[in-house]
Amino acid sequence: MDIRKRFVLELERLRRHNLQELHPLQQLFWESTLRCNVHCLHCGSDCTSSVTAPDMPKEDFLRVIDSITPHVNPNKVMVIVSGGEPLMRTDLAEIGRELNRRGYPWGMVTNGLAMTEKRYAELRQAGLTSMSVSFDGLHDNHVWLRQHPMAFEGAVRTIKLAAADKGLTWDVVTCVNQRSIHELEEMR
């Protein structure tokens, strides 16, 4: 092996070693609220629409972001807003704009129930770059698991908004269970 090849291989080995040693922050999940508009049977969070614990104030969250900013490249850290249900926050677009202004790409995990075309447009204007939508089965099984009669319609509406937007990275998150496993092929 010639010296150039050895040099390139050694540089690559060192790069990989540094990545393992440094383990750079790439994703930051923020559970932005404990409030939720559905009552999922499988949920591990203590979320309800009437939770008494207040949401973390936007200013406190942005202070946390500002404290890590000197130590990371914001463009390489995806901030993912989850909950509860992040759409329960009336200041979500403001938070997104502030993340975007600071150079952070941001996304969210949602059940889609509270998503409207207007809200979607507002979030996209605030810099929303990715979205995961919970979609757990066809109508009856999704409604059963989410414990809300309009849960399926909300998820489908949100998926359609995302699918029509070529600039958004999106996916669906499915909790497969004994009732929905036979529906997977049809859900594709």
Where are each of the predicted segments found?
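Alpha-helix N-cap and loop-to-helix initiation/capping positions
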Residues: 53-56, 60, 146-154
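Residue-level signal for the nucleotide or nucleotide-sugar donor/cofactor binding architecture
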Residues: 56, 90, 150, 179-182
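Generic alpha-helical structural signal
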Residues: 62, 66, 93, 153-156, ...
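Conserved radical SAM core fold
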Residues: 86-87, 112-117, 132-148, 178
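Short, hinge-like loop/turn segments at secondary-structure boundaries
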Residues: 124-127, 149-151, 188
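Conserved strand-turn element in the central/C-terminal portion of the radical SAM core barrel
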Residues: 158-183, 187
